[in-house]
Every structure is written in C-alpha cells, then in structure tokens.
Amino acid sequence: MQRILSSWFVQGMVKATSDMWLKGWDERNGGNVSLRLDAADVEPYRDEFYPAPRCVELSQPRTELAGCWFLVTGSGKFFRNVQLDPADTLVLLQITDDGMAYHIHWGLSNGGLPTSELASHFQSHAVRKAVSGGKDRVIMHCHATNLIALSFVLELDEARFTRLLWEGSTECLVVFPDGIGIVPWMVPGTDGIGSATSEQMKTHTLVLWPHHGIFGTGPTLDEAFGLIDTAEKSAEILVKVLSMGGMKQTITREELIALGERFGVTPHAGAIAL
C-alpha cells in the first residue's frame, strides 16, 4: 500500500468527504473540496509520485498561487467512494512556478481531472490566502439541503439572510460574525461564478450559491466543515420554524450585540442594524 494513503492530508480528506456524504450534502458526484498544502507536507511521499506528471493549463493564470500544492477531489467522483479508493477519487497537484498550469503528481489512478469547479476554488484560495495571511487553506463546496431550500423562500439579501441565520441558532453569530455572502444564480463550473464567489470571499467565509449550494473556507478541513455544518443547522431550524407559521419570539438585536461583545467578535454591520 502506498504510504501517502496514510498521510494526514489524505486521511483528513477521506473523513471530510465521508462526513459530508453522510450529512446528505453530496449526492452522486456533487460537491468538491480542496486543501492547500506546504511542500514539507508532500515531501516524504515524492517517491510515490508519477514519474511523468500530466500538465494541465489553467483557464486563468493564478500567479498568487504559483508553486502551491493542493489535494483536491476529482471531477465526476462520488464522495461516498472516496473512502473506498482515495487514489482514484482524489488528486495531488502543484501549480507551476509561472501560475499558468498545474501538474498532477498523484491520484486519479483511473484517469480524469480535478473538480470542474477548480477555477472557483483557486480564485477563492487566492483571496483567502491574502486576507487571512495564509491561515485559510480549505475551500469546501457542497449542496447543503436546508440552505438551498431557504434560497427559494428568503430574500437574497446578505444582511437579511445573515440575520435570520444568526437568530436561528445562538452559536451562529460567534461562528460566522462576518455573515454569509450571496451571489446570483450562475452556471456552475465557469470562471464567472468563480469570480463572483471570490469577490464575496474577500469579506465572508461563507458564500451562498442560490438554488445550488454553499462555499465555505477555513484553516482546516474540520473548521470549514464545522462552519458549513453550523449554518446548515440554523437553516434546518429556520425551515422548521417557517413551516410552523414563523417566529413568535427570537434573539433580539440587543442580545446579538451582547453576544458579540461576550465572544469578542464584530458582527456584520448590515445584519446587526436590521
């Protein structure tokens, strides 16, 4: 067995994708995850890399990520199968030094390419790497059921959507005080939706794709998963509350302000002002 299969990053991706599938967020080949790695992370496994790595040109240059390593889920791969065959469903790649292409060094053992949302991932990675000082390393996309459901019935206004999620569960303001960004419905797998998402990623760690899914970021796979899980739990509560006739009482503006002060976070200005 290849030693890389027991590496912390492959095992972490196996757990994350399995958890996401068990949550019901990633039907069939839905969803995609990418994890930015350091050269030191992959160095011990170089002897298991492909001797002649495939080179694939990027649709847009990513000079901000030149030389960076990523572990990414594969295009058309089912999350429920990652745990069964990580070497086929995952891919380890490195962006070239000029940022124009990437080399596939390991994975996709039966052929294929990284996720079709790779452009969106790289655009968001570039932004989050800059705004977090290199701390954020994960971009996670999934089809979180209740967040999608709310995108059909709530006004697609980031302040209002954020405020309702904060009110749906006390922990939400603490976990994502910067609120949730929203892009218009757009065709997936395009540079356009990637650009719109990365623009929202400048000020948000969560970005809603209406009628489609959610993008989340964080320093680790656990943090990104936990962020989405928290928002989705609140969305589930809101779906139930709305189906029961709506709120009769909720967390007030003053209480949300006090919550932010207690945990040392600054709430999204537009959402707290409502």
UniProtKB/Swiss-Prot annotation:
Entry GO CC: cytosol
Localization (cell): Cytoplasm
Reactions catalysed: L-rhamnulose 1-phosphate = (S)-lactaldehyde + dihydroxyacetone phosphate
InterPro entries: Aldolase_class_II_sugar_metab, Aldolase_II/adducin_N, Aldolase_II/adducin_N_sf, Rhamnulose-1-P_Aldolase
CDD domains to which the protein is assigned, alphabetical: Aldolase_II
Record-level Gene Ontology MF annotations: metal ion binding; rhamnulose-1-phosphate aldolase activity
Residue positions of the active site: 117
GO-annotated biological processes: pentose catabolic process; rhamnose catabolic process
Name this protein carries in UniProt: Rhamnulose-1-phosphate aldolase
A Pfam family hit: Aldolase_II
Free-text comment on the cofactor: Binds 1 zinc ion per subunit.
Known pathway: Carbohydrate degradation; L-rhamnose degradation; glycerone phosphate from L-rhamnose: step 3/3
Documented EC number(s): 4.1.2.19
Assigned protein family: Belongs to the aldolase class II family. RhaD subfamily.
Free-text function comment from the UniProt entry: Catalyzes the reversible cleavage of L-rhamnulose-1-phosphate to dihydroxyacetone phosphate (DHAP) and L-lactaldehyde.
Keywords: Cytoplasm, Lyase, Metal-binding, Rhamnose metabolism, Zinc
UniProt cofactor(s): Zn(2+)
SMART domains: Aldolase_II
Enzyme class: lyase
Binding site for Zn(2+): 141, 143, 212
Oligomer status and interactors: Homotetramer.
